C-alpha cells in the first residue's frame, strides 16, 4: 500500500493494529513513515517506534529525521548516533548526522560524518557538496572547492553544488568565477531563490549594483518573505543612496520576523547616514535592540577565570573583518605590536565570522594564539565555546556592521566584554561592559548616550597599519595644472544632498576648481548620471566633476596623487579613507559634528597635528576650503612633509597605541577582579598612562 501511495488507507490499517497491539514497534514505524508521507505530524509515532524497537537502526534514523525537520538538531544527533551504534555503515545516518551537526555549529564533527559516509559510498554528490559547504565554514576553502568540484563530476546538473561552489569561490575572492557558478545553477533551476540572492551578493561586491538589485528582486518574486534577501536588497539600495527604500526592506524583514536581529542591525546602521536623528532617540532604538537580544539569550553569571589582575589575559576577538578590509588595516599593526611587546601578558584568540582567508588574514592569524571559525555556529554554542576557552575579555570589532555577532555578547560568555574599532556608536547590548573611544570622539558629556561604560584611550581609538604598497607622494597637482582639485573617495552613500550643496558652494567660490569623486557606486552609469544631475541642480556642471569607480588598492591609493585637498562628508565622515589620504600627503577638511561618528574626523585631524583643518560649522567649512585652496605654496609644503608627519603621529605609532591599549585591557580586568573581591567599583579610573573610563 505504501509503494502504491495509498497512505490514508495504510494509516487507517495501522491505527487499527495499534488498537489491538499498542506496543507493536513495527506498527508504530509504519504509521510514522505513512504520516510523514502525507505531511502529517509523525513525531509521536516515530518516537514510539524507536522506544519499542531499541535495536532497529531504521527506527532511530526515522525518529532523527522527524526531529531534524522540527529543528530539534541536538535530539536528532542522538537518534542518528544510536542508529549508527546499531548499524555502523548506515550511510543515510552518517549523512544526516553531518547535516544536524553543521546546524549545531559542530563543523569538525560534521566533516567527519560526511567523510565517513563517503568512505562507504564514494560517489554521493550531495554529500560531497555538503562536505564542501562545511569546509567552507571552517575556512578550508581550497578543500571546499575540491569537494564541490567532485560533487559536480558525479552530478554536473546539481544546482545546489554549483551554488555551494559559488559561495566558496566568492570567499576566495574569485568573484567572476562565483558569478559563473551561480548562473550555471540558475540555468539548471531558474527558480532557485538562494542562487539568485547569492548572485546578487557577488554582483554587489563587483560594483554592479543595478544588476544586484535585479537579482534580489527575482529572488523575492520566488520567495517574497525571505528575510535574508530583503536584507540584501536593502543594503544594495542603501549603496545606491535610496535610504527610504532600504529602510522599507529592513522594516519588512522585521514585520515577517520581529526577532530578526540582523534586520534590526541593518536598520540601526542606516541611521548613520541620516542627519536629523537626536542622540536620545537613537539610544532608545539601540536599547530596544539590546532588549531583544537579551530575551533571546541565557547569559552566564559565573566563569572559571582566575581573578588575578596581573595574570596573562586571554583576549577574544569577534569580527567578520580580519581580512583585506578597513578593520583589518587598523588591527594588523596593533596586534603585531601587542604580540611583540606583551608576550606573556596578553594572548589573542580570534573568532572570525567570515570564511574569507587572504594574505592579511594570515598575517593577523600569526599574531593570535588561537583561531576558531564562528561561521555557522549558533550563539549559544559559540558562547559555550568561548567560556570554555577561558576568555577573560571578549572584544566586538563590528558593532552593527555586516557579519556582526552582537547577539552573542548578550550571552555574556566572558566576564569582561568591550566594543572597539569597527563601529562608532553604542551597541545597545546591556551585557557589553565597555566601549573603547578617545577624548576627541566621545567627550565626557556624551556618556549618557551609551549603554556601555566609555573607556577613553588617551589619544586615539584608531591606529592604522601603513600600506605595504610602495607609492610616492607626488607634488600637488595644482602646481602643474593651475587648478585646485578637491577629492572624496568615500562611500557614495555618505554624500547626501546637504553635502552636495556645500561642496557646490566650495567649487563656485574657488576659481577653476574641480571635484574628484571615486567610489564603487560610480561604476554604474545610472549612479554617475544621478550624481551629475544632483550637482547640476546646485549649479555645478560635468566639466568640474571627475567621477571614477573603484580600483585595486594600489591604484586607489595612487589616485590621491591627483588630489590637492580632500573634502570630508557629513554626518558620516571618512575613517580609513581619511587616514589613507593623509598617508598620501593630502590634507582632509572635516566638519565637527555632535556624535561619536560625526566627530571621527575631529579625532583623526587632531591626532595628525592638523587642527586647522577642522571646521566648526558649514560656514567655517566653506571659509576654510577657500582659505586653504588660496594658499598653494603652503599647501605644497604641507603635502611634502605630511606622510612623515602622520607616520610619527598616534595614528600610525603602533607600539605607542599598544601601550595604551594594553593598559586599558588591564584596567578593565582590574575592575572585574576588584568586584570579585568585594571591592567597590570606581566610577572613574585613570591609569598611569592616562586611560580613563566613566559612565
Residue ranges and their predicted role:
Residues 1-483, 501, 532-541, 546, ...:
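Alpha-helical solenoid repeat scaffolds of the TPR/TPR-like class and their adjacent stem/linker regions
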Residues 318, 489-490, 518, 548:
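Short hydrophobic "strand-cap" motifs at the C-terminus of beta-strands
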Residues 350-356, 514-529:
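Glycosyltransferase donor-sugar binding loop
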Residues 487-498:
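Substrate-binding clefts and catalytic carboxylate motifs of secreted carbohydrate-active enzymes
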Residues 491-492, 592-594:
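Short coil/turn segments
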Residues 502-509:
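Hinge/capping helix and adjacent helix->loop/strand transition within the periplasmic-binding protein
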Amino acid at each position: 500500500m505504501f509503494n502504491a501511495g495509498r497512505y490514508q488507507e495504510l494509516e487507517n490499517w495501522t491505527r487499527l493494529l495499534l488498537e489491538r497491539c499498542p506496543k507493536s514497534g513495527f506498527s508504530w514505524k509504519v504509521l510514522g513513515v505513512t504520516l510523514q508521507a502525507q505531511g502529517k505530524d509523525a513525531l509521536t509515532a516515530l518516537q514510539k517506534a524507536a522506544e519499542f524497537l531499541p535495536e532497529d537502526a531504521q527506527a532511530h534514523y526515522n525518529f532523527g529525521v522527524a526531529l531534524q525537520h522540527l529543528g530539534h538538531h541536538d535530539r536528532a544527533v542522538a537518534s542518528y548516533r544510536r542508529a549508527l551504534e546499531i548499524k555502523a555503515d548506515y550511510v543515510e545516518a552518517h549523512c544526516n548526522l553531518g547535516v544536524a551537526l553543521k546546524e549545531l555549529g559542530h563543523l569538525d564533527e560534521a566533516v567527519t560524518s560526511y567523510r565517513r559516509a563517503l568512505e562507504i559510498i564514494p560517489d554521493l554528490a550531495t554529500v560531497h557538496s555538503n562536505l564542501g559547504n562545511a569546509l567552507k565554514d571552517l575556512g578550508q576553502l581550497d578543500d571546499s572547492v575540491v569537494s564541490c568540484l567532485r560533487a559536480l563530476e558525479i552530478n554536473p546538473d546539481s544546482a545546489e553544488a554549483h551554488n555551494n561552489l559559488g559561495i566558496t569561490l566568492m570567499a576566495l575572492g574569485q568573484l567572476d568565477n562565483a558569478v559563473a557558478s551561480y548562473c550555471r545553477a540558475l540555468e539548471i533551476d531558474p527558480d532557485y531563490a538562494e542562487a539568485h540572492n547569492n548572485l546578487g551578493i557577488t554582483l554587489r561586491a563587483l560594483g554592479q549594483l543595478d544588476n544586484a538589485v535585479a537579482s534580489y528582486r527575482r529572488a523575492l518574486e520566488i520567495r517574497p518573505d525571505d528575510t535574508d534577501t530583503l536584507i540584501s536588497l536593502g543594503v544594495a539600495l542603501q549603496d545606491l543612496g535610496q535610504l527610504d527604500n532600504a529602510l522599507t526592506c529592513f522594516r519588512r524583514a522585521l514585520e515577517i520576523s520581529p526577532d530578526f536581529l540582523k534586520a534590526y542591525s541593518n536598520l540601526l546602521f542606516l541611521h548613520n547616514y541620516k542627519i536629523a536623528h537626536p542622540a536620545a532617540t537613537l539610544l532608545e532604538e539601540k536599547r530596544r535592540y539590546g532588549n531583544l537580544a537579551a530575551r533571546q539569550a541565557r547569559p552566564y553569571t559565573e566563569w572559571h577565570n582566575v581573578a588575578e589582575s596581573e595574570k596573562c589575559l586571554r583576549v577574544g576577538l569577534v569580527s567578520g573583518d580580519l581580512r583585506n578590509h578597513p578593520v583589518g588595516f587598523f588591527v594588523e599593526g596593533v596586534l603585531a605590536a601587542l604580540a611583540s611587546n606583551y608576550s606573556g601578558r596578553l594572548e589573542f584568540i580570534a573568532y572570525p565570522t567570515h570564511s574569507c582567508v587572504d594574505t592579511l588574514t594570515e598575517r593577523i592569524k600569526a599574531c593570535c594564539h588561537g583561531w576558531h571559525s564562528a561561521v555557522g555556529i549558533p550563539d549559544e554554542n559559540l558562547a559555550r565555546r568561548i567560556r570554555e576557552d577561558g576568555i577573560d575579555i571578549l572584544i566586538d570589532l563590528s558593532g552593527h556592521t555586516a557579519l556582526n555577532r552582537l547577539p552573542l555578547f548578550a550571552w555574556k560568555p566572558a566576564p569582561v566584554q568591550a566594543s572597539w574599532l569597527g563601529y562608532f556608536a553604542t551597541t545597545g547590548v546591556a551585557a557589553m561592559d565597555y566601549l573603547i573611544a578617545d577624548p576627541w570622539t566621545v567627550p565626557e558629556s556624551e556618556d549618557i548616550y551609551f549603554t556601555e561604560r566609555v573607556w577613553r584611550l588617551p589619544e586615539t581609538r584608531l591606529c592604522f597599519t601603513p600600506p605595504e604598497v610602495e607609492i610616492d607622494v607626488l607634488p600637488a597637482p595644482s602646481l602643474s595644472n593651475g587648478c585646485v582639485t578637491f577629492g572624496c573617495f568615500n562611500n557614495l552613500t555618505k554624500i547626501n544632498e546637504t553635502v552636495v550643496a556645500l561642496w557646490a558652494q566650495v567649487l563656485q567660490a574657488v576659481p577653476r576648481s574641480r571635484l574628484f569623486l571615486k567610489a564603487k557606486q560610480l561604476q554604474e552609469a545610472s549612479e554617475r548620471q544621478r550624481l551629475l544631475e544632483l550637482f547640476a541642480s546646485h549649479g555645478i556642471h560635468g566639466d568640474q566633476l571627475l567621477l571614477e569607480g573603484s580600483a585595486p588598492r594600489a591604484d586607489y591609493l595612487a589616485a590621491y596623487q591627483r588630489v590637492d585637498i580632500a573634502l570630508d562628508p557629513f554626518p558620516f565622515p571618512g575613517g580609513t579613507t581619511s587616514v589613507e589620504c593623509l598617508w598620501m600627503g593630502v590634507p582632509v577638511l572635516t566638519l565637527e559634528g555632535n556624535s561619536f561618528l560625526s566627530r571621527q574626523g575631529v579625532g583623526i585631524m587632531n591626532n595628525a597635528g592638523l587642527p586647522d583643518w577642522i571646521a566648526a560649522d558649514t560656514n567655517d567649512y566653506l571659509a576654510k576650503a577657500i582659505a586653504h585652496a588660496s594658499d598653494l605654496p603652503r599647501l605644497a609644503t604641507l603635502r611634502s612633509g605630511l606622510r612623515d608627519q602622520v607616520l610619527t603621529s598616534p595614528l600610525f605609532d603602533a607600539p605607542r597605541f599598544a601601550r595604551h591599549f594594553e593598559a586599558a585591557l588591564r584596567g578593565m580586568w582590574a575592575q572585574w577582579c576588584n568586584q570579585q573581591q568585594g571591592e567597590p567599583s570606581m566610577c572613574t579610573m585613570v591609569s598611569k598612562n592616562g586611560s580613563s573610563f566613566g559612565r
